[in-house]
Structures are given as structure tokens and as C-alpha cells.
Amino acid sequence: MARDKIALIGSGQIGGTLAHLIGLKELGDVVMFDIAEGVPQGKALDIAQSSPVDGFDAHYSGANSYEALDNAKVCIVTAGVPRKPGMSRDDLLSINLKVMEQVGAGIKKYAPDAFVICITNPLDAMVWALQKASGLPAKKVVGMAGVLDSARFRYFLADEFNVSVEDVTAFVLGGHGDTMVPLTKYSTVAGIPLPDLVKMGWTSQARIDEIVDRTRNGGAEIVNLLKTGSAYYAPAASAIAMAESYLRDKKRVLPCAAHLNGEFGVKDMYVGVPVVIGSKGVERIVEIELAGKDREAFDKSVAAVQGLVDACKKIAPDLLGR
């Protein structure tokens, strides 16, 4: 049986990490695309030469033309300018919006049946623009945000309680930014909700609040430490979890930036919510109940995303007609 074709649009740090993980998990053949001549070709060759050592079979190629995306089953988009110290995700908007228009046109022409995962920041606005530019069904275009944010939350909680990350579940909703909403009542250790663990004396509410705040600023913390770029190992691993659920019809429940059209009271926007990802793309949006402070925080996050989307509409009004 022929292997699935996975196109990586953008061959920087995340793109290279994605390519290697795809091989290690034997998810399919890889084509790496980038506008920088030689970069996708060189990285593809380098990773391909690791296959005899790592023990996987896959075909790798690099390209500078969108034609290489032809018939890709999955497209993962990392193209754009990375976030740098002192730069907010909002600062990236106008530059990366133009990139999404170009990428969307390429996907529309050569891979109209693909499942598309966007990683480019500011994420919630960029995945909205990418879906508009590509014209693909909304259920086939998602943004990688919640899996990463939840993974950071899980790691910090596991470290706090000195338990395995495998026994920690966490939910982070809303936009991928400072207004994200880590939900403590839906986050557990071996099935025990965080509020109960506070009552049991395992930790304090003040400490949980500190972890929530660190989760919200998880990306910025790494940017400030690296000084030359942003995170790439965890973002790549998060996108691979989404791609694998689609390719293997695993139907995992994952928090992603998904298109909402009435769910959670939101219309025509991409916001981080739990979804089921299977062979049809986003097969179900899990509309959990939000009340009190959680609802207020979610609405605030949605408003922040709306602000970015409105800015996109002003910069590229023609997107609305697609």
C-alpha cells in the first residue's frame, strides 16, 4: 500500500522537527517546502540519511514550488516570520497574513482534499485567514494551539505533584495567547480534579494560580530564554498528534483552534476548543459547559481573537469574498 504524502509548508526549526517525527512514527512520505532555495532540499536529505540509523522507511524531498504539494493528504503550515523577544503575536499579524494568503492559494490549487494544520502565529487569526484563502471546508482546517498549551499545563502540573505526565490530563481553551483559559476543574491527576487535590492538601490554590499563569506565558518564557526564536520541539510534537489522529482515524479528543459557527456562542471564528479528530477531519466539537469566571475568561479570550480577525479583515478585505 502506498504511503500517505505529508507536505510541510515551511522548513524552519518546527518544519525540520516535524519531518523527523513523521519518519520516526512512520506516518508517510514527506515533502518539505520553503521559499529559501536549498533549505528544504538540504533538510530533507539530512533527515532521509538518518532513516537507516533510526530504522524507518520513508521518501523525503524538498521543493521551492507549490506544485510539490500535489495530492498531499496532510499539509502542516509553519511558514511565516517567527516570534522574537519583545514581539507579541499581534505584531506578526500583517506580515504573516500575506504568507497565509500565498500558502492558501497553493493548497487550494494542488492539495484541495488535504487536512490542514496551521501552526503560524498569531495562530487563531492565521488559521482563520488560511481557511478563507484556501477555500477548504472548515472541518479540514485546524490550528495547533490547545494541544501545546495543554501539554505545557500537564508538564507543569506533573512537575508540581511529582507524578508521571501520563497520569495528568489538562484542558486549555480559548485563543493561543495571553488570554488562553486553562480549566482547572477539567484538569486531573489520575482522574482527580485539581480543586479536589487542593482540598486534599497536595497543593494550594495560590500555587495552582501560579502554574496557570506560567502556562499562559509558556511560549514567551521560551522565546525569552532562546533569544533567537521560539519553541519548536513541543509545537511539532503537538501537530504530529493531530496529524496522526487524522491519518489513523484515532478519533482523539484534542483541544484545537477549530472553526465555530454557533458553538459556545461564537460565529465564524477559530477558537481553541476540544474536538474529535478522525479521518473526516474535525468530526465533532465538544461543547463543554462554561460558567462563572471560566465563561468570563473564555469570552475575554474570544474578544481578543475577534480583534485579530477584524484586523485581518481590514488588511485583506478580499478574504471575506472567498
Curated annotation (Swiss-Prot):
Q: Where is the active site?
A: 176 (proton acceptor)
A GO BP term here is: tricarboxylic acid cycle
| Alphabetical UniProt keywords | NAD, Oxidoreductase, Tricarboxylic acid cycle
NCBIfam families linked: MalateDH_bact, PRK06223.1
What is the enzyme's main class? oxidoreductase
Q: Which reaction is catalysed here?
A: (S)-malate + NAD(+) = oxaloacetate + NADH + H(+)
**Known EC number(s)?**
1.1.1.37
Q: What is this protein called?
A: Malate dehydrogenase
List ligand-binding residues for substrate.
Answer: 83, 89, 121, 152
Q: Which family does it belong to?
A: Belongs to the LDH/MDH superfamily. MDH type 3 family.
